[in-house]
Amino acid sequence: MACLLPAAQTLPAGFLFLVLWASVLGDKLLVVPQDGSHWLSMKEIVEHLSERGHDIMVLVPEVNLLLGESKYYRRKIFSVTYSLEELQTRFRTFGNNHFLPGASLMGPLREYRNNMIVVDMFFSNCQSLLKDSATLSFLRENKFDALFTDPAMPCGVILAEYLNLPSVYLFRGFPCSLEHMLGQSPSPVSYVPRFYTKFSDHMTFPQRLANFIVNILENYLYYCLYSKYEIIASDLLKRDVSLPSLHQNSLWLLRYDFVFEYPRPVMPNMIFLGGINCKKKGKLTQEFEAYVNASGEHGIVVFSLGSMVSEIPEKKAMEIAEALGRIPQTVLWRYTGTRPSNLAKNTILVKWLPQNDLLGHPKTRAFITHSGSHGIYEGICNGVPMVMMPLFGDQMDNAKRMETRGAGVTLNVLEMTADDLENALKTVINNKSYKENIMRLSSLHKDRPIEPLDLAVFWVEYVMRHKGAPHLRPAAHDLTWYQYHSLDVIGFLLAIVLTVVFIVFKCCAYGCRKCFGGKGRVKKSHKSKTH
């Protein structure tokens, strides 16, 4: 140790700490991500783990959107059957289909078919990976300590079982209430609204009835989405597999915060990381700083419908542009489509914007969003009231939650007019209650003992240190469906009650025959003698 002292005197203490910390840790983590926006939060955790000295390998399809090279991790590339053009076309079609005429009329059926455009491609991706013997052999030889994945598309779940690795899931939500169904978390239909319903946790009788029916249909939806994965998992593992059985020894990192979500029962292996994507406000570039400064006392409005929507129909884009031109604020609109011909001087189109940094600026008055969870949490973190235009997935439910809390106004983007958008913007900007409500949510959200990113890193390291977290696993996983609902106990007790009732009935019947049956026969014989 003494030989290190001269060198140590010339190095910053922080650097020495990192070096020593890396030598203590250095576990090997295999990451199986989902491409697209799901990767953004996972990437933050991966980079932080890498900075703490862990050896990170990310399993990446050769054709992808966001899974690029990084100094924080190594990539293992595997081949897929689709091209970059097909990948981009599928995502673009998925986003733009929500603006088709009548998109809201078919409701769940159209949404399901539209989702399958992307889901089928992810399944093809998984199929290619699990049939790639060279990649599987490489992964076996590397002897990782844990696997980190997004279980929305369960390829990583299957791989964890194949490699016999403890797993950590990062998840936000998916149809079928996947995390609660597979995590054996109680989910009462009386006050826990189901996915796509747009209900709050205070439901009317008709809403509870609809919620009950949707809960039953979720099992069918689960089968439609995931039955194919059970086939390829059974083929790989050489035994019959049901996906629920593969989720038993896992830790769930859920991007939830009950400031935003409705309160509900949870399990001890569920850790909450809502707002993990929120960062401290950074300094704006010269370009955006100039836009903000030029807005004057009226300030700015930030407008983004996310990366999935690249083009809006011309008529709808012009309606939006007309509404934006009627407010005194400067509008920064992230939009890559054709420029509306009626775009007003106060509206600036940009292909990209530093959303969190702009939302954190004191001159920001409102946020027009598609209600994706990343954007919603950034709005909460920075205390900006919202005008929400949900398009697909959990966005309708997200918008309902914020509307219920009085922090925003929801519009149907397909049916709204320029007047509707103008009125919504003026409402959230001029009505002080919206700003007060979102600031209250922001204060509650930030009042926590540890930052979500640090909490996520702790639990991933926890699983690597202890080779899993089986002590947090609920025993519900070991029960059959009838044992879980105590139907065998109810049946046994019911049988006892029925047996006792039957015996009592028989005894009473026997007693009645003894008491009254004999007298009847005596009277009858007496009458016969008198005749």
Swiss-Prot record:
Induction, per UniProt: By dioxin.
Subcellular location, record wording: Microsome; Endoplasmic reticulum membrane
Spans traversing the lipid bilayer: 489-505
GO molecular function, one term: glucuronosyltransferase activity
Source domain of life: Eukaryota
Tissue: Expressed in liver, kidney and at very low levels in colon.
List of glycosylated residues: N293, N431
PROSITE patterns recorded: UDPGT
Chief site of localization: other
Keywords in alphabetical order: Endoplasmic reticulum, Glycoprotein, Glycosyltransferase, Membrane, Microsome, Signal, Transferase, Transmembrane, Transmembrane helix
One matching Pfam family: UDPGT
InterPro entries: UDP-glycosyltransferase, UDP_glucos_trans, UDP_glycos_trans_CS
GO cellular component: endoplasmic reticulum membrane; mitochondrial inner membrane
Residues spanning the signal sequence: 1-26
EC number of the protein: 2.4.1.17
PANTHER family cross-referenced by the UniProt entry: EG:EG0003.4 PROTEIN-RELATED (PTHR48043), UDP GLUCURONOSYLTRANSFERASE FAMILY 1 MEMBER A1 (PTHR48043:SF161)
Family under the similarity heading: Belongs to the UDP-glycosyltransferase family.
Protein task: UDP-glucuronosyltransferase (UGT) that catalyzes phase II biotransformation reactions in which lipophilic substrates are conjugated with glucuronic acid to facilitate their inactivation and excretion from the body. Essential for the elimination and detoxification of drugs, xenobiotics and endogenous compounds. Involved in the glucuronidation of arachidonic acid (AA) and AA-derived eicosanoids including 15-HETE and 20-HETE. Conjugates small planar phenolic molecules such as 4-nitrophenol, 1-naphthol, and 4-methylumbelliferone.
Protein name per its UniProtKB record: UDP-glucuronosyltransferase 1A6
UniProt organism field: Mus musculus
